[in-house]
A protein has these predicted regions:
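Iron-sulfur cluster-binding cysteine motifs and their immediate structural context
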Residues: 1-26, 31, 35-53, 226
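C-terminal structured domains
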Residues: 93-96, 113, 120
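Short, glycine-rich nucleotide/cofactor-binding loops
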Residues: 104-112
Length: 226
């Protein structure tokens, strides 16, 4: 019986193949985009450096420090160390730089983040999330976009507004800067303080519980898209 094939289907280089009850990842073909880890619903395949739990610990610290200092309307800007850092650097050199409430959050590949991270951004008290993807890697971002759409659907179902989260794949720093300065303000999300411990499903459950406890619309079920 064939199980979940999301990682196999989403891999842009076809580096993942079935191997009996498991899968096999060819390290010589793998491009390291992390889409497999991001789209995996259980954490059966993970991104090694950094591990998802460590990423969430850093996220919790970053958002918590900002809020403890009196910051409001926190926007987390997830970016990679190449396209994203270059874009932010250009904005600082030739533009106005990042708005004061935008917090850059560097990862190896933007496509490595999954539903556990996306939901935790808001569960820890951030108001907005933007994810920078290089235009040339747009084809690798299908898994990320699917997870973003799912997170937005859940946020909308709980009454938080789905427009709090977006993927940006523009190469023009001026366009990205203009977007960041024009972000609409939403109501502050009550900050959760759960520890990022356990596997991916546990982390998703913890984030959902925190969001549900303080949700404008505390429904018990949200119909998911097909």
């Amino acid at each position: 019986q064939i199980g979940c094939t999301r990682c196999i289907d989403i891999c842009p280089t076809s580096a993942i193949t079935p191997a009996g009850d498991h899968i096999d990842v060819d390290p010589y073909i793998c491009a390291g985009c992390g889409s497999c880890a991001g789209t995996c619903p259980t954490g059966a395949i993970t991104y090694s450096l950094p591990a998802g739990e460590l990423l969430l610990k850093r996220l919790r610290t970053v958002v918590g420090t900002y809020l403890d200092a009196g910051g409001i309307d926190a926007t987390i800007l997830v970016h990679d160390s190449e396209h994203g850092e270059d874009l932010i650097g250009m904005m600082a050199r030739v533009g106005d730089g990042l708005p004061a409430n935008v917090i850059p959050f560097s990862v190896n590949e933007t496509t490595q983040v999954g539903l556990d991270f996306l939901l935790s951004v808001f569960a820890y008290g951030a108001s907005q999330l933007r994810l920078l993807v290089a235009p040339q890697k747009r084809e690798e971002a299908d898994g990320l976009i699917t997870q973003v759409d799912l997170a937005a659907h859940v946020l909308e179902g709980l009454g938080y507004d789905e427009d709090r989260i977006k993927v940006l794949d523009d190469a023009d720093p001026s366009a990205v800067e203009e977007h960041l300065y024009a972000i609409d303000k939403f109501s502050q999300i009550v900050r959760g303080d759960f520890l990022p411990m356990g596997g991916k499903t546990t982390l998703i459950r913890s984030a959902l519980q925190s969001l549900h406890d303080n949700a404008p619309r505390q429904v018990n079920e949200i119909e998911l898209p097909a």
